[in-house]
Amino acid sequence: MYRVGIGFDAHPLEANKKGLYLGGVKVSEEYSSIGHSDGDALIHAIVDAILGATNAGNIGIWFPENEENRGRRSTEFLEIIRKKILAGKYEILNIDSVIIIDKVRMNPHIENIRLKLARILGISKGNINVKPKSGNTLYGNSVSVYAVCMLKKVGT
């Protein structure tokens, strides 16, 4: 049985020296996203896509905005979802994503992002696609991400 899920996340950006993380990779020293956790919109969208494909709720149910998750690295969210939702039950066939951001040029970071996500999920980077778009100034000081994943239920 095949399952498909879609995820979306968006965060405003602010100029500072904390740095912006997308896909677990620092992509900017000049900006950071404003969020309860580390604000990694790419991982948040992927987590929601996986949860949607498995009918397991959404990121807010699994990782609510509480003190435990304040400032938490989103890579931990993805690791938990891999262990509790995917492990032994589903195989990731494909993840496709679009990052819309005006402030940061993403192309130099795409391969590192794909490698990082592949390591966390235990899959080939060939199963992960990340497409950056500038937004043509329509999105201003923000980052928005759409992600889709296709899973196969193990044993079917």
Curated annotation (Swiss-Prot):
Binding site for 4-CDP-2-C-methyl-D-erythritol 2-phosphate: D9, A10, H11, H36, S37, N58, I59, G60
Classification via PROSITE patterns: ISPF (PS01350)
InterPro entries: MECDP_synthase (IPR003526), MECDP_synthase_CS (IPR020555), MECDP_synthase_sf (IPR036571)
Essential cofactor(s): a divalent metal cation
GO molecular function ontology, one term from the record: 2-C-methyl-D-erythritol 2,4-cyclodiphosphate synthase activity
BP terms from Gene Ontology: isopentenyl diphosphate biosynthetic process, methylerythritol 4-phosphate pathway; terpenoid biosynthetic process
Keyword terms of this UniProt record: Isoprene biosynthesis, Lyase, Metal-binding
Residues annotated to bind a divalent metal cation: D9, H11, H44
EC number: 4.6.1.12
Cofactor note: Binds 1 divalent metal cation per subunit.
Reactions catalysed, as given in the entry: 4-CDP-2-C-methyl-D-erythritol 2-phosphate = 2-C-methyl-D-erythritol 2,4-cyclic diphosphate + CMP
Enzyme kind, highest EC tier: lyase
Positions marked as site (Transition state stabilizer): H36, S134
Pathway(s) of this molecule: Isoprenoid biosynthesis; isopentenyl diphosphate biosynthesis via DXP pathway; isopentenyl diphosphate from 1-deoxy-D-xylulose 5-phosphate: step 4/6
Family named by the database record: Belongs to the IspF family.
Assembly and interaction partners: Homotrimer.
Function of the molecule: Involved in the biosynthesis of isopentenyl diphosphate (IPP) and dimethylallyl diphosphate (DMAPP), two major building blocks of isoprenoid compounds. Catalyzes the conversion of 4-diphosphocytidyl-2-C-methyl-D-erythritol 2-phosphate (CDP-ME2P) to 2-C-methyl-D-erythritol 2,4-cyclodiphosphate (ME-CPP) with a corresponding release of cytidine 5-monophosphate (CMP).
Name the UniProt record assigns to this protein: 2-C-methyl-D-erythritol 2,4-cyclodiphosphate synthase
